[in-house]
């Protein structure tokens, strides 16, 4: 979990970590992603996952409307997909910043 946590924190200096629902959540202009252990590995869930491009085909929908996740069964699998995960994390951060700026712009026009 620490390898994936470090990848998330490497996205930028303004990433904040908070424990919610007994799991680590990461925030950047709102909720960005979270890490969740499973009995056979762990997964990273992206809060705005339904808006991500998923060009690598790694994001899974399962039975969720908005959240998309990537399940890892081993550290080797995580290391093998490191570059793709970093790209998804960066895209998620850019998306959150975009939505934050749009919301801020709407408030200024009122």
Annotate each language-model stretch with its function.
Residues 1-110:
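Charge-dense, helix-prone N-terminal extensions
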């Amino acid at each position: 979990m620490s390898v994936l946590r470090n990848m998330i924190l490497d996205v930028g200096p303004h990433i904040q970590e908070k424990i919610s629902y007994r799991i680590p959540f990461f925030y950047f202009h709102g909720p960005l992603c979270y890490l969740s252990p499973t009995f056979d590995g762990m997964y990273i869930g992206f809060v705005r996952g339904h808006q991500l491009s998923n060009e690598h085909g790694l994001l899974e929908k399962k039975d969720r409307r908005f959240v998309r996740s990537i399940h890892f069964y081993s550290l080797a699998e995580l290391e093998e997909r490191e570059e793709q995960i970093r790209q998804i994390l960066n895209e998620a951060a850019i998306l959150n910043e975009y939505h934050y700026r749009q919301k801020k712009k709407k408030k200024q026009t009122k």
